[in-house]
Amino acid sequence: MVFFNGRLLALKEDSPPYAMDPVTLETKGIYDFEGQLPSLTFTAHPKFDPATGEMVCFGYEARGDGTPDVCYYSVSPTGQFTEVVWLVAPLPAMIHDFAVTDNWVRDLFSPKRCANSLHRLFSPSYLKCATLNA
């Protein structure tokens, strides 16, 4: 759960955010940032720039289940997407969390893969790290 730009958002890694009423906690529905959300998924652990208030996010399997596509985006405190970056990961993997510095985004691709009709099957050989210049 995050409160951002006047909205309470429930976050789950393999879906878009859901808006909720901050008083009643009633679910209002999918929130796509007024049509700006470029990815089918949204991290459950966005990071916030303490100097600017900007929210840094990503979506893995961003074009659908089992795809290696990852989409990173920055959102201004007023809810405007300021940067969108697409990349293809070395494998379709779950990205549980990430770290952000002034110059870098660091991800750990969890050792899970699609196999035998199982969406996420543990595979230690798939453990990878990726560092991107922010």
Regions found by a protein language model. Give the residues of each.
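Well-ordered mid-protein domain cores that form the structural environment of catalytic cofactors
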Residues: 1-81
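Leucine-rich repeat
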Residues: 73, 82, 86, 106, ...
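Short hydrophobic-aromatic micro-motifs
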Residues: 10, 105-107
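Beta-rich, blade/repeat-based domains predominating
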Residues: 44-45, 95-100
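Short, conserved, GDST-rich strand-edge loop motifs in beta-rich repeat architectures
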Residues: 62, 111-133
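Conduit-forming functional cores of very large proteins
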Residues: 102-103, 132-134
